[in-house]
Design a protein with these regions (language model features):
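Gram-negative bacterial Sec-dependent N-terminal signal peptides
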Residues: 1-18
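Histidine-rich, glycine-flanked metal-binding segment
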Residues: 29, 33-73, 95
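Metal-associated gating/positioning segment near the N- to mid-region
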Residues: 71-139, 143-145, 161-164, 227, ...
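Active-site gating loops and adjacent loop-to-helix segments of metal-dependent hydrolytic enzymes
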Residues: 83-104, 161-180, 215-225, 282-318
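Histidine/acidic-residue-rich catalytic or RNA/ligand-binding cores of hydrolases
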Residues: 87-90, 134, 163-164, 217, ...
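Divalent metal-dependent hydrolysis catalytic cores, especially in the metallo-beta-lactamase
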Residues: 107-134, 147-157, 203-214, 242, ...
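Histidine/acidic residue-rich metal-binding segments in metalloenzymes
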Residues: 136, 190-285, 301, 316-334
Length: 424
């Protein structure tokens, strides 16, 4: 995975990194989120990489970018997006059956650029439909054909028949006959096959679902047996792939953690035993709280945007959102940052910070989750997540102090990704 991702490290898609050295004068520098913020600093970038970081305003080498009135920090990382879609509910289900694969790839690029301009220079895409759009977009960025954030992609998500990833849920027999089922599995042997298929298609990470989902309308209970989860996770790990697990109910989360999951996505319901298993496994918790914004906004526009069964689950999700984070963070569970963008809006990824702070995380730790912690989760800690010599020049800037008011991260003044200026 890392070799493919680093192949495009010196370029930002079609525009490429700036050829000459670039000097950035930063008024305040959050070089390593979670550590002390530095005062006036100078960052030198060359060939897409950070060459040096020094105190004070040093003479410019090549082009000068003046950010002396800004807070400068590493490019943000969203560990849970669906880059090829910006719809959900009835509209999203219709799109699955009416939009072509090439159109979904164009949509991925459209959403990717909104995400990049919002300061998120890396994303982890946790599930396409059957389009493979995120894989194609990832590779096009790496080849320099188009612009976009660095993408770590799961390809298609895996679940059991009738589980969260079964697109046939609620459809008639004629639709069922033409629906993809190769990402569904039943029994350990079949689940090993499903992982191997996604790896063969180029997945960087494996995403599985141990419970139903809010949008799938089949309930939020556990939808996978112990031997199936074990087969999925062990097979993925044998290929060197981390495993992200969609789970809402506590039993599905415990099932995943017992079997070595690397991250839990959503984790909406959590008890003390769940927290203990998180810490024992060393897994990262990705709360995706800002999905609530997406649900509320769609329902405000159309009260019938979701089928009744889904609407019931949305009401439950809204009522309990943030409770697990309030339990997990003080207990020492490692928190990572993800939005589930596609359910919520691409380009508004920073809304998640406000939710995290609302539910008990200091702004500094929420920012660390979206940089240092996520870089570790993605296996890219040597490349991204901090502003240090040798790393990819993924750098953003905001007016004001995001430690005092994390909402400052909703308005990005400057974006550099892999040494190329996207927004200034």
């Amino acid at each position: 995975m890392i070799g493919r991702l680093l192949a495009g490290a010196a370029m930002l898609g079609a525009s490429g990194a700036l050829a000459a050295p670039v000097t950035i004068h930063a008024g305040r520098l959050m070089a390593v989120p979670g550590q002390a913020v530095r005062g006036p600093s100078t960052i030198v970038v060359d060939n897409g990489r950070i060459v040096s970081v020094t105190a004070g305003y040093q003479p410019a080498s090549g082009q000068l970018i003046d950010l002396r009135d800004k807070t400068v920090l590493p490019g943000l990382i969203d560990a849970h997006v669906h880059i090829d879609s910006d719809r959900a509910g009835n509209e999203g289900q219709l799109a699955e059956f009416t939009e072509s694969v090439p159109l979904r790839a164009f949509e991925a690029q459209w959403n990717g650029m909104k995400t990049l301009r919002a300061g998120f220079t890396t994303v982890r895409n946790l599930g396409d439909g059957d389009s493979g759009a995120s894989l194609a977009y990832r590779d096009a960025i790496a080849r320099g054909w188009v612009q976009g954030p660095r993408i770590v992609s799961a390809g298609q998500s895996i679940s059991t028949t009738g589980g969260h990833m079964d697109g046939r849920n609620g459809t008639n027999d004629e639709v069922d006959a033409h629906s993809a089922t190769h990402h569904l599995c039943d029994g350990p042997a079949d689940c090993r096959r499903a992982v191997r298929l996604q790896v063969s298609r180029g997945a960087d990470v494996i995403k599985i679902a141990t419970t139903g989902g809010v949008n799938s309308g089949t309930g939020l209970m556990t939808r996978m047996e112990e031997d199936e989860a074990q087969a999925l996770i062990r097979t993925a790990h044998s290929y060197g792939k981390k495993v992200a697990v969609h789970s809402h109910g506590r039993d599905g989360t415990k099932l995943a953690l017992r079997n070595g999951a690397d991250s839990i996505e959503h984790g909406t319901d959590m008890d003390d035993e769940t927290v203990r298993l998180f810490k024992q496994a060393g897994a990262c918790y990705v709360p995706t709280l800002s999905t609530v914004n997406g649900y509320l906004e769609r329902l405000a526009k159309d009260p019938n945007a979701y089928p009744p069964a889904v609407k019931k689950q949305i009401d439950w999700r809204i009522g309990i959102t943030g409770k697990s984070l309030e339990k997990a963070y003080p207990a020492g569970v490692k928190i990572c940052f993800g939005t589930d963008a596609g359910v919520s809006k691409h380009g508004r990824n920073a809304d998640e910070f406000e939710w995290m702070v609302k539910h008990g995380m200091p702004a500094a730790q929420a920012i660390k989750a979206a940089t240092v912690n996520n870089a570790e989760l993605l296996g890219l800690a040597s490349e991204i997540g901090t502003i240090e010599p040798g790393k990819s020049a993924d750098i953003i800037a905001v007016a004001g102090d995001p430690l005092a008011d994390v909402r400052a991260l909703k308005t990005i003044s400057f974006v550099m990704a892999r040494g190329a200026v996207v927004t200034n």
